[in-house]
Amino acid sequence: MVDVLLSLTLPNDVAQDVEDLLLSRPDLVRGFTASVAEGHGSVVQLVEPGELVAGHAPRTQIRMVGPEENMRAVLALLKAQLPRANLFYWLVPVIEMGRL
């Protein structure tokens, strides 16, 4: 099986729901990394006054590696369970991974 990297960028207000969903499915997700991010650009809606002043919206980025089939199942699960979560995602092949 080919491993892929699934990256999710999402509004902070849904991050806990996404993390809880991922943690509930250890059969699909071995683990993940969540970090603070900032959304920039014309596709990012700035709503709060602080966002308008700063010019970016606070986001959370979650990354996980696993078999492509599992990562696609994660996307389907997110779409079914959190249809309005406003998630941006991408999948890329993993050439190599390991622990040093």
Question: What are the residue ranges of the model-derived segments?
Answer:
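Positively charged, small/polar-rich N-terminal and surface patches that mediate targeting and assembly
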Residues: 1-100
